[in-house]
Curated annotation (Swiss-Prot):
Subunit structure: Heterodimer of LeuC and LeuD.
Cofactor names: [4Fe-4S] cluster
NCBIfam families, A to Z: leuC, PRK05478.1, PRK12466.1
Listed EC numbers: 4.2.1.33
Originating species: Shewanella frigidimarina (strain NCIMB 400)
HAMAP family: LeuC_type1
Reaction catalyzed: (2R,3S)-3-isopropylmalate = (2S)-2-isopropylmalate
Binding-site residues, [4Fe-4S] cluster: C351, C411, C414
PANTHER family named in the record: 3-ISOPROPYLMALATE DEHYDRATASE, HOMOACONITASE, MITOCHONDRIAL-RELATED
Enzyme class label: lyase
Organism superkingdom: Bacteria
GO annotation, biological process: L-leucine biosynthetic process
Purpose: Catalyzes the isomerization between 2-isopropylmalate and 3-isopropylmalate, via the formation of 2-isopropylmaleate.
Protein name: 3-isopropylmalate dehydratase large subunit
Length: 470
């Protein structure tokens, strides 16, 4: 008889959601929460109308407007014709199909991966999907969360299920404690730098270790948000007291006796001691410094006290070619100190780093300082709740007095899809998740950093090591 081993966190959630496993076919997986937005949902709703179908579970579908909305005005008149069509179509579809919508006038409107968790829509042990690649964010709660395509969006709307092949298991353990100035963003960039853009392809990654357990829920969301950037299907962190304390009392979280039952069940959501992972990776938290990307993918990253790498020292020919191409686009010379790189734009926001703790850490470096001459810096809260809390704490005043622009919630400059974008030649310190060619605008050059690093760069006019006086 084959020896039975324990299960990983991923396997526990996966196994509990299998509806059917037809021989020779991909298993059918039940979906607990479906998040939709204005960009990837119109064709899906159209498909339902053509087929004469209704939503299988409208109460498990939640919609918001975020990708194409303006961060300057809540008026529809501020939108481009295409963006206006998209948000109006979403509103019409939600009304017709009975979907709860957080539109641009709703106080809880925001980036889908920010407002979902803060409303308690995201819960441990659930399967969550969205037509957006950074759905992995919700894995911070011990949920299995991943992005899907528009045709799959339609399938979930109609059936509340998906056909999915099971992924392999990877464990990434970060041992020890991080030093001052090192954040969740730095941890995940260091992980991606170690594994590369495709190091997680075919895997669901469980993040664990002392450094991960010490993170707040907002830090864990930053971590899981970027699991996709190393090719992983999803990222997960086992729920614990930090998770439960964050969720308690939130609008869609269980209440009263149901809460106690839920916590008891959630407490079992952790990998068994004898669980087997296909790959295990270990990092020492003490070795991680504030990180900064130098190239055109998140894996092209070094510590702030490092230099732009030389492609000639790379033994892998494919990597060497990629490095040369990246340096040509980004306009940097090998050997350049990272602290000598000047910037003219700063973006603090996105589903990676637009939560209240992110804004607090950025405000520390903005307080009683001024944005450097020639630098344009914007701060975009991730949701209406984040914006309100930041304003109650006076963070908006700190940013405005320092010369930052304080905006309305939205995806903003993370992607060149709305009216917040970079011009050709701009060099931006960005707290977003992707630094691909043209991601923030045609010909733009993006460097991924933490909110603290971005704010410090804004006032210095160049990248600085925030662990030292500047």
């Amino acid at each position: 008889m084959a020896q039975v081993t324990g299960k990983t966190l991923y396997e526990k959630v996966w196994d509990s959601h299998i509806v059917a496993s037809p021989e020779g076919e991909a298993p059918v997986v039940y979906v607990d929460r479906h998040l939709v937005h204005e960009v990837t949902s119109p064709q899906a709703f159209s498909g339902l109308k053509v087929a004469g179908r209704k939503l299988r579970a409208p109460q498990k579908t939640f919609a918001t407007m975020d990708h194409n909305t303006s961060t300057r005005s809540a008026s529809l008149d501020a939108l481009s014709p295409m963006a206006r069509t998209q948000v109006e179509t979403l509103a019409q579809n939600c009304k017709e199909f009975g979907v709860r919508l957080y539109d641009i006038h709703h106080p809880n409107q925001g980036i889908v991966h920010v407002m979902g968790p803060e409303l308690g829509i995201t819960l441990p042990g659930t399967v969550i999907v969205c037509g957006d690649s950074h759905t992995a964010t919700h894995g911070a709660f011990g949920a299995l969360a991943f992005g899907i395509g528009t045709s799959e969006v339609e399938h979930v709307l109609a059936t509340q299920t998906l056909r999915q092949l099971k992924a392999k298991n990877m464990k990434v353990e970060v041992r020890g404690k991080v030093t001052d100035g090192v954040t969740a963003k730095d941890i995940v960039l260091a992980i991606i730098g170690k594994l590369g853009m495709d190091g997680g392809t075919g895997y669901v990654v469980e993040f664990c270790g002392e450094a991960i357990e010490a993170l707040t829920m907002e830090g864990r969301m930053t971590l899981c948000n970027m699991a996709i950037e190393m090719g992983a299907k999803a990222g997960m962190v086992a729920p614990d007291e930090t998770t439960f304390n964050y969720l308690k009392g939130r609008e869609f979280a269980p209440k009263d006796a149901m809460w106690e039952q839920a916590v008891a069940a959630w407490s079992e959501l952790k990998s068994d001691a004898d669980a087997v992972f296909d790959v295990e990776v270990v990092l020492d938290a003490n070795d991680i410094a504030p990180q900064l990307t130098w190239g055109t993918n998140p894996g092209q990253v070094v510590a702030i006290d490092g230099v732009v790498p030389n492609p000639e020292t790379e033994t892998n020919s494919t990597n060497r070619t990629s490095m040369i191409k990246a340096l040509e686009y980004i306009g940097l010379t090998p050997g350049t100190k990272m602290t000598d790189i000047s910037i003219n734009k700063v973006f603090i926001g996105s589903c990676t780093n637009s939560r209240i703790e992110d804004l607090r850490s950025a405000a520390v470096h903005a307080k009683n300082r001024k944005v450097a001459e020639g630098v344009v810096a914007i701060v975009v809260p991730g949701s209406g709740q984040v914006k309100l809390q930041a304003e109650e704490e006076g963070l908006d005043k700190i940013f405005i007095e320092a010369g930052f622009e304080w905006r309305l919630p939205g995806c903003s400059m993370c992607l060149a899809m709305n009216d917040d974008r970079l011009d050709a030649g701009d060099r931006c310190a960005s707290t977003s998740n992707r630094n691909f060619e043209g991601r923030q605008g045609r010909g733009s050059r993006t460097h991924l950093v933490s909110p603290a690093m971005a704010a410090a760069a804004a006032v210095a006019g160049h990248f600085v090591d925030i662990r030292k006086p500047y």
